[in-house]
Amino acid sequence: WSSDVCSSDLSSQVSQLRGQLEDSFLIVNLADSTKNIDVSIDLLLLVAPKELSVDTVFAIDQFLMGGGSVVIFSSPLDVTSQSVNISIIPHKSGLEDWLLHHGIEIKNELVSDMKNSSFPIPVDRKIGDYTIRETQLINYPFFIDVREDVLENSRDINQGLEQITVTWASPISIINQNKKSDHRFFLNSSKNSWSSDNFDIQPNFNKYPDIGFPTANEKALINLGVILDGNFLSYFREPPNQPDIDEN
């Protein structure tokens, strides 16, 4: 299940993911307007959901209540490009309150990691009185390089993976967790990481000559993925279009 409204780059990635999954699984597409999810579906995969309606969130909720498994790739932030510049914009999935109900908070911040992958990006360079813009392959702190030493901690989930690059990620945490469910984090950055609400993702080597971006004095491992398992309480007191949706 992916949003009908997504960038061409994301659409390409979703198509690649679908192609790989089709080698082993039967794939069923669901529209954003879906109000009922067949219980025969083994796994509901939500890729970059965007502005889901209350009816759709209710369908997801009831699928989970019926014992279904749900995997969500989501962030409160999105990346957009204009000309040669890239920037961060807000992203609303429609699942924010539903996730909080289950104790999952995705912070409105970006994670940076000194252990990162490279990224070709336009960089301004001064030559005498002139400034030129050229594309350089730089170590990009927002492209978090997760290696086998981290992945092996959750080998049942990450089996066969030796490396993952997690791009423009936000911190994920557990708050006010429902006591009937258990959680474990399965994906994290290195200990040389930090998060910030500074969303300038264009490097400035004139101001920050080391890596092109400001760093934090305090660095620590940051969680990027979590698994919840067990019994869940519905977010809804009643079906949509009726009063009193429980947002606690």
Functional labels for PLM-detected ranges:
Residues 4-248:
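Acidic, S/T/G-rich, low-cysteine, solvent-exposed domains in lumenal/extracellular/periplasmic regions
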